[in-house]
């Protein structure tokens, strides 16, 4: 009898329209960022070992540039780093308003391709070469160096990366 009564109550609650179920809109930004980090940390670590870019930097840039995977470029083009087409880009692209209207951004088959291309983008450009003289654990130097080399136009870019790295303990991936 108790089981039957419990079942009736459960059914009546589940049919109420006011009963909320977990959805993306109910997840806090902090939880979304943690989910993003959990999902992409393996790619960041793999690329760190191969290309020598601290995983903490890669993850912080991914979180910031992609809006933790929820930004337009991340959703429509799997572009998690805001990388523009630049001269010589022969891959797919998408048009998007950024610093200027209707700019060309790289488009990828999946986010992991974006993670790899981010590493290649930094390795292959002379303006970032000084970063590779820094120690892997010098995330502050990397953050400031990316800003100084012109990766982003936001004057607070380095501070935002540093804040994300410290708030979410991203240096744990730099080991």
Which residues make up each language-model segment?
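Sec-dependent N-terminal signal peptides
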Residues: 4-13
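Catalytic cores of secreted/periplasmic lytic hydrolases that degrade extracellular macromolecules
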Residues: 16-175
